[in-house]
A protein has these predicted regions:
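Two-metal-ion acidic nuclease core segments, chiefly of the RNase H-like superfamily
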Residues: 118-136
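C-terminal accessory extensions appended to soluble enzyme cores
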Residues: 93, 161-228
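Short, flexible loop/turn elements at secondary-structure junctions
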Residues: 5, 21-25, 60-62, 107-109, ...
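RNase H-like two-metal-ion nuclease catalytic core shared by retroviral integrases
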Residues: 135-157
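Electropositive, glycine- and tryptophan-enriched low-complexity nucleic-acid-binding patches
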Residues: 41-104, 109
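Charge-mixed, compositionally biased segments that are often intrinsically disordered regulatory tracts
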Residues: 1-41
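Acidic, metal-coordinating catalytic cores used for nucleic-acid/nucleotide bond scission
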Residues: 105-118, 139-145
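Extended hydrophobic secondary-structure segments that form protein cores and membrane-embedded regions
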Residues: 17-18, 100-107, 135-140, 173-174
Length: 228
């Protein structure tokens, strides 16, 4: 993994990003631990939340830039690729010279390289934007080394001791955290995503023809090459 990341960071037309979803946040008057300078009344039992939000993060390690997407629906394969596409739309003019994205991921249930809908959506992304995407997965029990994980710890410390009793409050705290002196760019995602979407075996075989898997490590390193 270090070799892949170092090579990406040293290549002028390649941009490396780290992507992951944080644990779902319950919206409501719930105690979250931590300390507050003001007296805050919280519920003494975790009743049904008023809403939930799952932060999806995209982090650019070499630039120390962070992007958060507050998802109010299920974080599915479609959701993750939609966040990736939304992010690219906001930065593509800055990175017009970039031809390859190297994406650091953990091997989660919605984004692993055998997840048929995830791979189909990434193939569509590559075709649409004419970018090569290289997926570089951290092995089991090593996701803590994914750079985005360090950002989640900062966010958690930032809002501990606070009642996250509305979606606006969650977004406000996400916007005011800092990483190396910079605030993240934060977006709210209200689209509804269905779970369980998958391809047929025959359809996935067609997708596999667009994938280049590293021999012996095919689950962990996958290239989706842009069309010529």
């Amino acid at each position: 993994m270090n070799c892949i990341n170092q090579a990406a960071d040293a290549t002028e037309d390649t941009l490396r990003l780290s992507m992951d979803a944080k644990a779902t946040v319950k919206i409501g008057p719930f105690s979250r631990g931590g300390k507050s300078r003001i007296q805050v009344a919280a519920a003494d039992h975790d009743f049904a939340p008023e809403a939930t939000m799952t932060p999806v993060g995209i982090f650019l390690p070499t630039l120390a830039e962070l992007f958060f997407y507050g998802v109010t629906s299920h974080v599915t394969s479609d959701c993750l690729v939609d966040c990736l596409a939304q992010w690219w739309e906001t930065v593509r003019e800055r990175f017009a010279h970039i031809t390859t994205l190297v994406v650091n991921l953990d091997n989660g249930p919605e984004n692993h390289s055998r997840r048929t809908q995830f791979m189909q959506r990434l193939v569509d992304f590559v075709r649409h934007y004419r970018l090569t995407v290289r997926l570089a997965y951290y092995p089991p029990y090593h996701s803590k080394y994914n750079p985005i994980e360090r950002c989640w710890g900062i966010l958690e410390n930032h809002w501990n001791g606070t009642l996250l009793d509305s979606i606006d409050t969650v977004l406000a705290f996400a916007r005011t955290m800092t990483w190396q002196g910079r605030h993240p760019i934060v977006h709210l995602v209200t689209a509804t995503y269905e779970t369980g979407v998958k391809l047929t075996k025959d359809a996935m075989q067609q997708v596999e023809t667009q994938l280049q898997r590293l021999p012996a490590l095919g689950k962990w390193f996958v290239d989706i090459v842009a069309p010529v």
